[in-house]
């Protein structure tokens, strides 16, 4: 057994190999509130900039305050998501570790079974070889006895 099957490969290694846009999609799926907060913050900044250009200072100030609040909410979502994702990642790693341990145990049991079968095969070959040798010895003894019998028969015929 050459190693662990591909189903045991960690997903983090495959994330590192993804193209940039695929990484963005992956992380957006992991923490959906962060991109939402980023978009809302960007929208608040755009509306504040538009109100500054038109000269509406009060509305610009309101949108800048919204930007600060949305940015804070985004940071809270980022930290909370990292905490939640980190703990679930640890759980996944422990589950993967259990699966690896189980796979190693299966591999060890399979190797032991193969070794046991190999020993049985060697034992049977040894017994077959001993049986062949015994058969050859018996055949030699039978041929000797047949020769002696013929000699005795010829000796008895000669005496008559």
UniProtKB/Swiss-Prot annotation:
Q: Which UniProt keywords apply?
A: Coiled coil, Membrane, Mitochondrion, Transmembrane, Transmembrane helix
Recorded hits in Pfam families, A to Z, give: HIG_1_N
What membrane topology is given?
A: Multi-pass membrane protein
Protein's UniProt keywords contain Membrane: yes
The Gene Ontology biological process terms listed for this entry are: mitochondrial respirasome assembly
Q: Where in the cell is it found?
A: Mitochondrion membrane
Coiled coil ranges: 88-160
- InterPro entries, per this entry? Hypoxia_induced_domain (IPR007667), RCF1 (IPR050355)
Describe the location of the HIG1 domain by residue ranges: 5-96
Q: Which GO terms describe its cellular component?
A: mitochondrial membrane
Could you list the residue ranges that cross the membrane?
33-49, 67-89
Query: Mainly resides where?
Result: mitochondrion
Role according to the record: Cytochrome c oxidase subunit which plays a role in assembly of respiratory supercomplexes.
What binding partners and quaternary form does the record give?
Associates with the respiratory chain complex III/complex IV supercomplex.
Q: Which PANTHER family match?
A: HIG1 DOMAIN FAMILY MEMBER 1A (PTHR12297:SF3), HYPOXIA-INDUCBILE GENE 1 HIG1 -RELATED (PTHR12297)
| Protein family according to the UniProt entry | Belongs to the RCF1 family.
Q: By what name is this protein known? A: Respiratory supercomplex factor 1, mitochondrial
As recorded in Swiss-Prot or TrEMBL, the protein's gene is named RCF1
